[in-house]
Each structure stands twice: as C-alpha cells, then as structure tokens.
C-alpha cells in the first residue's frame, strides 16, 4: 500500500566458519555499523522534513559508543519526541515505523542462534535445518519485501515488536523474517508428507509442487500480508506448544453444581491454559440444586478462575457463557457485570455472556406479548429449535410449568441496558444457526457459539467444537494505478490473486490443524471428526476505500456480494479437491446435507451469483466429499489488523484516527487511506496542514469538518466512520454476504448517545429486529457506543480495549 524509500534489507556479513557449500547468511548477525548507517539515512530523511532529531535529547553516536543498545536508545528517544506529530504527517508515521524496525534488528540474532534459542519443536527445527540453502534464498526474497513491510505504519511496527515476535534470552528478539519463516515452515511441514494438500494449493490443479515450493508459497503470502494467521498461530507456530486452535465450544451438562465445577476443572481450565477462546453452554437440568442461586454461584466460581488465569498469562483467554432467554436466571445474568452488578457475590466482570435467542422471543417482542421463564423442568427446550421449540414452549406455558412471566419488552430492554452498559450480552439467533447447518439438527439443536459469535459448530457427549482460523487481508489484493495530478489513485480488486490466496489459505490452515496439539480428549475427537476451519477477512472497509468508494455505495454492495461468493466458492472447491486427490471426507459426510447436493447458500434462494462453477462444485462434492465440514467464518481481527493497519474484519473503521495515552506520551494510529487521499488532494503543505487541523478540531470526522461544503462525489465523503454509517445498511451488507458464510459473522452494532447522554433502547431493539428479519445468525456481537460529548469509544468498563481477550483469542 506504500512505496519503500529507505530501509536497507537486513543482511549482515559477520560470518563464522561453516561447512563448504552452506549458506553463509545462515550464520550472519546484524552489526552496529550496518544499523547505524540505516539510522543515519532515516535521520536525514526526518531532518529534510523539518524534524531535528538532535533535539530529541539523545547523545551522539560515535566509534566508542556505537553499540546495539545505544542505537536502540537513540531510536526510542526520537520516536517519543516526534510520534505525536504523525497526525499531521503520513510520511513521518512511516519513517518512525522504519525506526522501530531498526530497533527490532538491534535485538535479533543469527538464524542458527535463533533456532537454538527460540524453543522450536525438534521437527520444525529439523525441517528448517535440512533446507539451509533454501532458507537463505527465502530470506533474500524477504529482503525484497521488507522495505515495504517496514513502512506499513508505526502501529504495525510496534505491534510486531511488543507482542508477536518471539522473546529470546537476554532481551533478544526473533526477527520479522524469522517470525514469518517459523510459521511458514510449520505449515509446510504439515504439507510435506501429504500429496493431496500439496496439489490442492494451486487452483489450476496442474502442478504437484514439492515441499520447498509450498514452503515458499506460504512464506511469501505471509510476508506480503496476504494471509494473516490468528494470534495463536503467530505466537506458537513451530514451538513445542503447537496450540493453533482459536475457538472451543463446550457443552456442560451438569446435573448438580458440583458437576459443573468438575467440568471446569477437567475441561475448561485446560482449554484456557491452551490460550483458546471458549464458548460455553451450561445446562439447566432438572436436578440442579434447589437453591435458585446454584447456577450463579457456579458462574461466580468460573469468573474467579478466569481472573486468576489471566492475571498470570502472557496472553489472556476469554470465555462466553451462552444462555437462552427462558432460563430462570436470565434477569440475574443481565445484571451481573459492571455498573449493573449490585451484589459482589454474583458479579462476573471477567465472563462474557450471550443470549441464544429463539425466534419465538422475537415474535413475542414484536407483538408486545409476554415471556415465560422456566427452571430445569424445561431443560429439553435447549434441544429444540424452530416450530418444534415453539410448540413445546407454548405447551409448557399451558401446563403452568413456568416460574415467572415478564413482558417480552422488559426482557429485551434489560438485554439492551446490559449491552450498552457492560458490553454483553451478545445475541445469536438459534433457529438461523440450526436451520442452516449441514446436519439435520432436529431434536439435538446446537446450544452455543464461540467467544466471538462467528463459529457454528455442534458438540455432543464425545466431542467439543474446535475451529482453526485464518484471515485474508483484502487490502493486499487492491492494485492501485497512478491517477491524474490532484486526484487520489483508484484501485482495482484482483479477484484472480484473491482466489489463489483462498486456495493457499485453505491448505495452510488444514496443514497447521493436522499438527496442532489440543488440550482435552473431546477437543481432539471434535477436531478429527469434522475438521472445521474458518477463513475470514480483514480490511473490508479499507479495500473499499482503496477502490474509491465508501461502504454506503452501490459499488460496495457489488463488491461485498462478489467478494464473499469468491471466498466461499474457492475454499469449498479446494476442500473438495483435497478429497478428490485421495483424502477422506470429514466423518459423517454421507449423513450430511452435502451428500445430497446441498450448499449453505441454498437457504437464500434469492441470492445473486457472479461466478460460474457452483453446479460443478455440487456434483464434485457429491462424488468426492468435503475434507472440511465448514470453511468461512467472519471473525473480528482487532489484534492482527494492527499488524496490517487495515480495518478490522468486515467492520467499518471506528474513527479516522486511533489514539491512546501511554507512559511515554500519545500513541496514534492513522487511517492511511484518508491521509493518502488528503496528500493527493492538497499537495500544498500549508493548505494540507490547514485541512488536517480542521479535521483534528472536528474529531477526525470528515462529515463534521466539512459538512455540506463537500460535493456528494468528493473523495473525502467516503470516509464516514462506524458511528456515522447507516446501521441498517451495514446489516444489509451482512445479509447479502450471509449465503456464503457457512459459520457466522461477528456483527457489531454502533450507536451514538443522544444529546442528553441517553442511548435509546428502541434504536438498538430496531437493529436487533432488523438483523432477525434478515435471517442473520449473529444479531449482535458488541453494541459499541459513542458518547455524545466525545469521539472516544466506550463500552461500559474497558471491554473495548484492543487487548480484550475476545480480540486476542480469535485474531
């Protein structure tokens, strides 16, 4: 997305003795002199733009003080001195990013030392060592893309440094190239002995690549940030841990509180220690303790365990408990977080909650009807959905089995009050989830999703749901051409390259899944049985902006439909191709709807199609099967999107600038597409500065800064933020892509306080009803609120932070 200007590719020629013919660079380490030259080059570039680096307070570097530590310290002082000014200077933002990458390089070690210090598994280390010369070739290719990568942005560089690069002994770091190499090597190792995986990596099916070709393919896709792995893979790929699964769905069927506590000890805690995000259903069995607070006490125990675990974990985990709205404790659950929790004994601030919403509740709400709560005598309702659920629910009402009755609107408004005050509950629609599943779920309905509401997966006595994720960076597939002077460049989306990457990503995540360690036996069973994967996207809004249109445009609607059709078609073709090449379909395929020619999109008969190939795919699936039971999931990507500096997942940008105060000053992330557009429109520095200052005074809202002064087709009008976007239109986009998303999508709602500081519950209720009528599986992930008096996003306590466990667990 940006051109490189200065960073010299890392290659240092300090060699030690090595065997004849081996790649010398394998033993090479960075040198202070090399990095000092890079630093001087960048300092000169900063001075040319008016930033006097000598004023940062750093001592001058000379022959006697030229150490790695001194270089790193000088870089830190320069960054802290000028980072607040990036809001007015995109090039400064990129130059400071390059400085961070030099600081990273002051802490790196040679490839040989990295293999010894990183804690790689024996198998991954051997895979790399057997290919020393080829690895050196890969690092040369990395040197060609590293200048561009190092200029993605300051936020990206700092995220690599602080979180994703492996920490070695004595304060050393793995390099960015080693980071990508580790992930690619582990995935290639999963392909090395699987000819079907290797052949399926190319869409044309005419090539049978060797392990090195696949290794290179994975490596370059990662370096170019086309494929962005989830956080578990980035942290643990190739290590002894091998914890690659992102999502676990557990169904706890306890007859007593002690049964739930046993399950916590035997299954939930091991999964938490594997750093996976958890979606949990807790049964409302007839034999729960007579004390009506039994479930709440169990939840409190679980909440305390989550808090204790995260307090000592380098990577926090998160857990979401799914409850149906007829549950006897529903009103208590809606008052157990944040400012709504009046009783410390039942406060559960570390636990997320979600409502597994039956259609009948939404119908009762719309009709202004009543809603009945039940105890464990109605536990079997959890196994039913659709008409079966409605008939049984109404029968129980007629038999007076209920323990309390409320106006349905009271329950809905309690839900909304909790959502806007504390961040939860999330909302998923039970009927839409089960109706569109590839198995007939009559009498055995699915009861929960995952932590982030985008995974649909069955559980039973023998297995829990497991899903392995990855995402595609859509901005990486936008090819931009030079525009006329004074106009921003307009990009074109490369569907061919995107579909190639879809095939690579499908094999990539399957390869990692085949090597993954899982924390409990039921997870291993679930993983081996269904091989569920979720391939999603990040940068949807950014890709729209780079193509010259906003989310509310006709072009965005067309792009949305075509993009996700391409994603679904290609991933399913690849999964089918793996079976055609000799691998067995997922267990239970012959009993699935797929075996009869069904596809997920058949639930939306009015869909529009852009691509040929669906009819042939149906026939091939019937003939050969599918290796994976599900393939497309649109997860939030709050953490990994900071590496690519694109918009999160399918979501619009929160604001055109992100800012937080730290101990070293203000850290800022820019909307690079907006800054590039402003630079093109206003080449005069003084005029451009005036425009940026105007935006700053209006909280970086182009609508607030310019209002009606901008013509409707002006390039800046497309930069509306999430809170300025038409929420019904965002839901329409979700509905249009829904046929091609066989898992689900983390649908977030964005609302703004009224001038009196209130959030209108009727507004949120209308959006939930709209999502329900569109047939979405996820009605509401987060409900994010912007204060009327501020542009900062808040969510009750601090659940909107970018280190939120819900963000880290998935992506």
Curated annotation (Swiss-Prot):
Keyword Nucleotide-binding found: yes
Residue numbers binding substrate: 231, 246-247, 277, 450-454, 636-640
Keyword Nucleotide-binding attributed: yes
Any one GO MF annotation of this record: ATP binding
Site (Interacts with thioredoxin/glutaredoxin): 807, 810
Biological processes, Gene Ontology terms: deoxyribonucleotide biosynthetic process; DNA replication; release from viral latency
Enzyme class: oxidoreductase
Assigned keywords, A-Z: ATP-binding, Disulfide bond, DNA replication, Early protein, Host-virus interaction, Nucleotide-binding, Oxidoreductase, Viral latency, Viral reactivation from latency
InterPro entries: HSV_RIR1, NrdE_NrdA_C, RNR_lg_C, RNR_lsu_N, Rrm1
Disulphide connectivity of cysteines: 247-467
Site, as annotated: Important for electron transfer: 781-782
Reaction(s) the record says it catalyses: a 2'-deoxyribonucleoside 5'-diphosphate + [thioredoxin]-disulfide + H2O = a ribonucleoside 5'-diphosphate + [thioredoxin]-dithiol
Catalytic residues identified in the record: 450 (proton acceptor), 452 (cysteine radical intermediate), 454 (proton acceptor)
Enzyme Commission code(s) on record: 1.17.4.1
Pfam families: Ribonuc_red_lgC, Ribonuc_red_lgN
Site description Important for hydrogen atom transfer, residues in chain: 247, 467
Role noted for this protein: Ribonucleoside-diphosphate reductase holoenzyme provides the precursors necessary for viral DNA synthesis. Allows virus growth in non-dividing cells, as well as reactivation from latency in infected hosts. Catalyzes the biosynthesis of deoxyribonucleotides from the corresponding ribonucleotides.
Similarity comment: family membership: Belongs to the ribonucleoside diphosphate reductase large chain family.
Subunit structure comment from the entry: Heterotetramer composed of a homodimer of the large subunit (R1) and a homodimer of the small subunit (R2). Larger multisubunit protein complex are also active, composed of (R1)n(R2)n.
Name of the molecule in the record: Ribonucleoside-diphosphate reductase large subunit
């Amino acid at each position: 997305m940006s051109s490189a200007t200065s960073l010299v590719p890392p290659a240092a020629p300090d060699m030690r003795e090595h065997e004849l013919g081996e790649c010398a660079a394998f033993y090479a380490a960075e040198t202070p002199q090399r990095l000092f030259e890079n630093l001087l080059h960048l300092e000169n570039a900063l001075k040319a733009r008016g930033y006097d680096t000598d004023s940062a307070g750093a001592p001058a570097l000379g022959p006697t003080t030229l150490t790695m530590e001194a270089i790193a310290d000088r870089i830190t002082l320069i960054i802290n001195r000028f980072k607040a000014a990036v809001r007015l200077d995109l090039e400064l933002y990129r130059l400071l990013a390059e400085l961070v990458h030099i600081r990273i390089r002051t802490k790196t070690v040679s490839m040989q030392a990295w293999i010894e210090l990183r804690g790689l598994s024996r198998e991954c280390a051997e895979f790399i060592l057997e290919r020393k010369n080829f690895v050196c070739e890969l690092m040369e290719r990395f040197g060609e893309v590293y200048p561009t990568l190092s200029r993605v942005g300051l936020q990206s560089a700092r995220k690599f440094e602080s979180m994703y690069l492996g920490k070695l002994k004595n304060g050393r770091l793995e390099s960015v190239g080693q980071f990508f190499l580790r992930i690619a090597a582990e995935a290639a190792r999963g392909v090395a002995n699987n000819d079907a995986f290797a052949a399926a990596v190319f869409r044309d099916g005419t090539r049978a690549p060797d392990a090195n070709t696949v290794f290179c393919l994975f490596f370059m896709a990662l370096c170019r940030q086309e494929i962005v792995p989830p956080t578990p893979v980035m942290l643990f790929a190739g290590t002894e841990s091998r914890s690659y699964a992102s999502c676990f769905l557990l169904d706890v069927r306890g007859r007593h509180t002690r049964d739930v506590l046993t399950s916590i000890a035997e299954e939930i805690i091991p999964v938490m220690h594997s750093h996976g995000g958890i979606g949990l259903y807790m049964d409302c069995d007839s034999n729960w303790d007579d004390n009506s607070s039994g479930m709440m006490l169990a939840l409190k125990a679980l909440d305390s365990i989550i808090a204790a675990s995260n307090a000592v974990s380098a990577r926090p985990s998160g857990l979401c408990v799914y409850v149906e709205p007829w549950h006897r404790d529903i009103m208590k659950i809606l008052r157990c977080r944040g400012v709504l929790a009046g009783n410390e004994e039942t406060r559960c601030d570390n636990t997320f909650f979600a409502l597994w919403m039956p259609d009948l509740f939404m119908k009762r709400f719309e009709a202004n009807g009543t809603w009945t709560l039940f105890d464990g005598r109605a536990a079997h309702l959890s196994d039913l959905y659709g008409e079966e659920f409605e008939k049984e629910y109404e029968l129980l009402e007629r038999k007076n089995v209920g323990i309390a009755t409320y106006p349905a609107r009271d329950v809905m408004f309690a839900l909304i009050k909790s959502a806007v005050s504390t961040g939860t509950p999330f909302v998923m629609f039970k009927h839409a989830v089960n109706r569109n599943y590839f198995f007939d779920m009559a009498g055995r309905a699915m009861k929960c999703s995952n932590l982030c509401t985008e995974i649909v997966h069955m559980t039973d006595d023998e297995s829990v749901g497991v899903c392995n994720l990855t995402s595609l960076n859509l901005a990486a597939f936008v090819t931009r051409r030079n525009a006329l002077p004074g106009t921003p460049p307009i990009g074109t989306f490369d569907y061919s390259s995107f579909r190639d990457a879809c095939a690579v990503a499908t094999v990539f995540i399957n390869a990692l899944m085949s090597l993954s360690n899982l924390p409990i036996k039921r997870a291993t069973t679930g993983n081996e049985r269904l091989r569920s994967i979720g391939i999603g996207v990040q940068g949807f809004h950014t890709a729209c902006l780079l193509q010259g249109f906003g989310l509310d445009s006709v072009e965005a609607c067309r792009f949305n439909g075509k993009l996700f059709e391409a994603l679904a078609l290609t991933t399913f073709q690849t999964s089918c191709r793996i079976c055609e090449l000799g691998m067995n379909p997922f267990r239970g395929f012959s009993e699935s709807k797929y075996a009869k020619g069904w596809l997920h999109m058949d639930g939306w008969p009015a869909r529009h199609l852009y691509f040929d190939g669906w009819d042939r795919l149906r026939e091939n699936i019937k003939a050969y099967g599918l290796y994976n039971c599900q393939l497309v999931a649109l997860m939030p990507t709050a953490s990994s999107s900071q590496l690519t500096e694109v918009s999160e997942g399918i979501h619009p940008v929160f604001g055109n600038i992100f800012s937080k105060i730290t101990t070293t000053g203000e850290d800022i992330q820019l909307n690079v597409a907006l800054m590039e557009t402003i630079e093109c429109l206003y080449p005069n520095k003084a005029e451009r500065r005036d425009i940026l200052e105007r935006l700053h005074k209006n909280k970086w809202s182009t609508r607030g800064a310019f209002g009606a002064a901008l013509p409707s087709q002006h390039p800046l009008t497309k930069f509306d933020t999430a809170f300025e976007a038409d929420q019904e239109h965002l839901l329409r986009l979700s509905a249009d892509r829904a046929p091609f998303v066989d898992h689900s999508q983390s649908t977030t709602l964005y609302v703004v306080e009224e001038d009196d500081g209130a959030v209108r519950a009727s507004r949120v209720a209308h959006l939930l009803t709209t999502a329900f009528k569109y047939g979405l599986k996820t009605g509401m992930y987060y409900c994010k609120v912007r204060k009327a008096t501020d542009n900062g996003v808040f969510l009750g306590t601090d659940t909107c932070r970018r280190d939120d466990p819900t963000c880290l667990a998935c992506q």
